Structure formats: structure tokens, C-alpha cells
Amino acid sequence: MLHDEPTLAEYDAFAAVFNEIAYNCGAIAAGYDFNCALFSTYAGSDCIGSSYETYVNKYATLMQDTRISFDNYPFYYVSKDGIFNSSSENLLEDSWYSDMQTVRANANGKGICIQSFTAGAQVESSWFTKTTKYRYIDKEAEISMQVYTALAYGFTNLDYFVYWDTMVRAMHEANGNTGQVFQKTPIMWNDASDWSKGHYQSDYYDWIKNTNAEAKSLFEILSKFTSTGVQLIDGSTSGSNAFGSATTTNTTNAIAVSATYDMVVGGFTADGYNGYLAVNADFPDDSGTRTNTATFTVGMQYSKAIVYVDGIATVVRVAKDGTFDLNIGCGEGIFIIPIA
């Protein structure tokens, strides 16, 4: 990684160093890979400048032989009484989808690979009380939803935020912050006050491991296709529609979809076939078990659809009216290929 979260003001100096290493020193020719984790919109104007479009575009223009990735913890609580507790309200960051859209748009045409950093740790800290936002992950569906959504947007590399909680906490405490920064992480100490007592793998470790295995199986299929953009489907259930300023970008091979809850549908194409990665964009409920029922209309020229779930293919029959129904689990995604 070249840099974590560079500001717009740092770009010119950053690009000079990158060019020296990448080209003058021959790192690119030698096969080395470079990436940089950019800020997301919610970092604010001090970091990204006047607009996220300007921030991402300048990076993509200056440093084309890199991968673009960005930091975003999309799930958060807003405290109702000044402290983090059960009265807090669960929300989804409304810039999450639009940030992915901006990164994708600026990478396309420049040959830049796009990489997603998946939030895999929970933040509960006095450091965040200035915004009353507490970034969190507390179920596997919140990890898998991020991964499947990134794949639907055409991201081709995945990475995860994973921390040893006390190490990051100690760094912040050294700066006068006594809040517990990353309270729940994939690796936890048995005794945070005595590191000699060792550590253990938490549920977060298994959640990431399981999700990554699913993503790897799916990507083996997706890698044979070319991404054509996404459709953002507003669910019929009141209280959904949380895509913010993001818009549908797939006008090449769009599919008609109606769903109970919000849905992201990534479009793909390969050798005359259309593919669709349908992701349940319903904000994960407390149980993590709520499914999204969707009707897909592919047309009467199709007789069936191959449906991949966790990399395993099944065949779904298309009705005479050209439709078929599917249930998509909380935080899950399925890949669909209509067949004549």
C-alpha cells in the first residue's frame, strides 16, 4: 500500500514519489502492485476538498498504474442520549453507494483496478462522540452485504479492515484519547491489560473467513464476465430506499426487477450471455435472517436461469410470462444467468 487516506492537498507530492518508485526505479516493470486507500465522502472537505468527484478524479489521473480503494464504515449508530447503548438508532451511511459509483466511474476508461475495503471491526469510541456516530459491525450479514455489493459494482479486489483491538486502542490512548477505539475485532486479547495471556479468534474472524470463501467462489464465475454497471431497485416496503444520491448506471443489459426490500443488481455480460448479481440491500435487521423476495422479468425467450448461490449452481424454471421469483437472504447475493 502506498498511502492510507491521502488528502487532496497531498496528491501532487504523493504522485512525485509514486512516479519515482513506480517508473524511475522500475517497480511497475518488475511486477510490483500498488494500491492506495482513499477517504470516503464523510471524511469531510478538509480531507477530500470541494467534492468527492474531484478528489477521486485527480488521484485516478495522477496515478493510473495503481488500484483505487476507499475507506468506508457504512453501518453506524446515532446515539439518542449521548452514549452508545440499546437506545441508539441503526443507520446506513448515505454516501456509501455514491462513493462506489464515483470510484467506478473514474477508474473506468483509465484501466484502473478498483478494490473494496470491507469494514470488519466495530468502533465504539469517545473519539467519535463529536459526530455522535458509532461505526459498528455486529453480524456476518453486515460483512457479506458489503462484499456482494462491491462485486455487483464491478470491484475486482477485496480487502478487509482487521485489527488487534488493544494495539490500535493503545495508539489512540497515547494521544490522550481514553476511548476504546476498536472494541470488537477478528483478533482479541484474552486480557487487554496483560498481552502475555495471549489472544483468540473472535466470531468476526469466522465471519470474514466465511464471506471471503463465498466471494472467492463467486468471483471465479464473475471473472469471466465484464461489468456493465448497476441497477438500484427501490423495495416496495415502506422505510427502505436508502441509496442516497447514487443512481442506476446499467443501461446496457438492464433486467426488470421488483423486490420487497431494496436491491442492488450488478449487470454483467460475456459471449452473448447476460449475468446479474442480485444483492439484498435491505439494511440487516436485528436477527440477520430477513429475506428479500424478488421477481425477475427476463422475457419469454428464456426457459430457465442458472442461479449461483455460494458458488453452487442450480436451475430455476422461467414461467410462461418470462418471470421467476427468488428469495435472497439477509446480506446475501446471488448470480443469475438467463438461458434460452
Residue ranges and their predicted role:
Residues M1-A340:
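Glycan-processing catalytic domains of CAZymes
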